[in-house]
């Protein structure tokens, strides 16, 4: 009897696991080799949880066949790419899809059959704007008309698809959610960038007010607190863009006492300005999230913030994670970001060491010659960075360690010059320890920054300058994102 019960339990467990698994077979008749890569759009998901042990990297064909199990609890969008062939798959538990790459006529094509194929035929939605066509527009009328036109065309395409292919209710619900938020997503994404094309005009504030009013009307037309929306990749795209653009807009309004009190309640003006100056990015976005969103949408907005922290700036990362864990102890996103959270905990525990050297009087330097004098007779790589600069954080995380490892037994000095970070010495020290930025450090004043940019020809951040032993210097040719091998070659030629 006991043995029978165990067998029944194992059988139930097997059936449950199978029901949570979708099978996809890719057949490549164009080539026996090659690879398929996957991207998970929408709310952050764990590729390891979906794909298992082989989650990292791409997946390779063997004799033209690739079989992949995907673990899903509900209809999940997955974007695949294989050479020039790419598209969305909407995968449900129990699906058994066959995706065939072949030549039909004079074109490479994709044919999808099998269980779940009714959710995965060609849909033909228009999901992006031709930004070039509107690049000189200072008012939103034309782009709004185009968005409305696209929306109507997409609605027709979806209804045509439903009639022809009979997709599942879950697919129809997902498409309805995506369509509901697409106009808002397109407008917020476009208008946020478009302001840079007219910000030098005398009537900038009046123009921006027109764009803001149109955006508000789109926001009022939908419910951005809808808990159902958290499953939509389009809503997540909107939410991430909205947080970015709202943050930028509020930066321009921080002198307004009403705005300041909303986001820094209970503080004096001086306290609020100090708090805002210390972290106008991660911590400020967290304040926005808690002011603007509730429930599941608040949790999703936190996930967007954690995703940005994972990608670039780690300022106040541990404190934000602590608050998120306390607020949502059972959140699925804690599993998604577990590797990043572990890394943050480890790095936050680091302290400054004697190899992290702050040049005495460096904050008072007014010209690049004073910097050169301090490193006279040395080969030096200068990293121009800033605590506020996302790409700087990305490049330090990616390249600082490998560069130091490469030149470990060679006479190369590493120097980090922070820019536009006056008054943020304590914040800089935390980041320097966090990223283990061993080397020489200067927190430049504006005069020094301007002189360095003028003399070296650097035009932005991050930038890299190589100083030779004879005191001459040159700008890195490695570009951005950094071509590390190119920079290594340039430094070695300077030794």
Language-model segments: residues:
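Thiol-based oxidoreductase modules, predominantly thioredoxin-like and allied folds used
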Residues: 409-425, 436-448
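Bacterial Sec-dependent N-terminal signal peptides
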Residues: 1-24, 386, 494-495
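Active-site acidic short loop of glycosyltransferases
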Residues: 376-378, 409, 437, 458
